[in-house]
Amino acid sequence: MSVFLCFLCLLPLILIFLKNLKPSKWKLPPGPKKLPIIGNLHQRRELHPRNSRNLSEKYGPIVFLRYGFVPVVVISSKEAAEEVLKTHDLECCSRPETVGTRAISYNFKDIGFAPYGEDWRTMRKLSVVELFSSKKLQSFRYIREEENDLCVKKLSDLASRRSLVNLEKTLFTLVGSIVCRIGFGINLRECEFVDEDSIDDLVHKSEDVIRNSIFSDFFPGLMGRLIEWIFSERKRLNRLYSEVDTFFQNILDDHLKPGRESSDIIDVMIDMMKKQEKEGDSFKFTTDHLKGMISDIFLAGVGTSSTTLIWAMTELIRNPRVMKKVQDEIRTTLGDKKERITEEDLNQLHYFKLMVKEIFRLHPAAPLLLPRETLSHVKIQGYDIPAKTQIMINAYAIARDPKLWTNPDEFNPDRFLDSSIDYRGLNFELLPFGSGRRICPGMTMGIAIVELGLLNLLYFFDWGLPEKEEAKEIITGNEVALDLVQVFLH
């Protein structure tokens, strides 16, 4: 009986494998050799942004892989990216489904991971109107400035006592405080169910839910679920998801309390739900839509901006020449007697803006843009890309392509002095926020948070590392190492 069950489990895989042995009618992109059944699943590490540069060097700017029975195309050139994100944007604008993204998006009722369709269009339009429009961006300015003032006060106290600073945690707290006030009306210093110190942990657990692939993501039917059960894959995913979901549910419960005074995008959605119950609209908001929006705001808002700020300070500390040039411009332009920084101060700075652009180039928050999925067959650079193929845009590799950039691995804002290249989705050699229909809707908010945060850190303080050993680590290493830094009042 057990042998028969194993045969039934393996039968779909055997049939699909035999089907794949037939010569393909498509002119598929080149790629590494695929093993029976698992394809290139054993080479998933190759899709790490740094490793995938090696793939493109060996096979070209368009590489075809197969993870189990999931076809994947990796794009690593400006020209191919433009075809995907502009020429064939509509045909390539959906999202693949995985167990992790289904969980974190509440059954794809969000913006980031939802497939292309009515739900996605409605949610995106709502987010733009209620959260990311120019008018809303300006209305939240005081929150960004107040939270930066509090961060400066805290750092000034540490500097006066010559205490070391965990800058990584400090930046997660700063961004988390801004995003939670803007998105959810929650002050982390007064909140009953979350505090400042737990923000980075919640972000990392949310990211783990998305990144944790399990067998059913690559293999159909009973076989994938059986292997999941044997290795308890779903249990670990559910445990991570449960912690994150509790946080999101607490945010929603806080909005449902009677007598709530503040109004944010979640309150707007709750009001729309109540009206729809009476009016019977064709599109109906559900609790999953509410939590999907909460998830997007928290994960995309906190995770990306925090990571960018951390990388910016890492590069500046290990490149003191650039830091001095940026600080000289800031302090000469703004003077040395300002008690607080406002967003108006940003308009006076030029080299500072080039430095931010160089950070977006060298360290995009999403080195591999969120994967797209083709809705129909398309041709990219002469190759056939069938429907239901995952497309991964390697923004990291494109931004370090030696054909496009001189000394591409060097942190050098001067490269943009006479350049009109921008990072807002129209120049395909620089794609930190993506492009086309699925461009990050919170781009302007993210830029505002990063620029104001960096300006405060560089105007009021000087930065260094406490010991030579640590300095060597951050200068030569590729990873972020800002757990302990020295801060000095300017």
Swiss-Prot record:
Keywords: Heme, Iron, Membrane, Metal-binding, Monooxygenase, Oxidoreductase, Transmembrane, Transmembrane helix. One of its GO terms (molecular function) is oxidoreductase activity, acting on paired donors, with incorporation or reduction of molecular oxygen. It is an enzyme of class 1 (oxidoreductase). The keyword Cell wall biogenesis/degradation does not apply. Heme binds at C440. It is a single-pass membrane protein. Its cofactor is heme. The chain crosses the membrane at residues 1-21. CDD domains: CYP71-like. GO terms for cellular component: extracellular region; membrane. Its EC number is 1.14.-.-. Belongs to the cytochrome P450 family. This is Cytochrome P450 71B28. It comes from Arabidopsis thaliana.
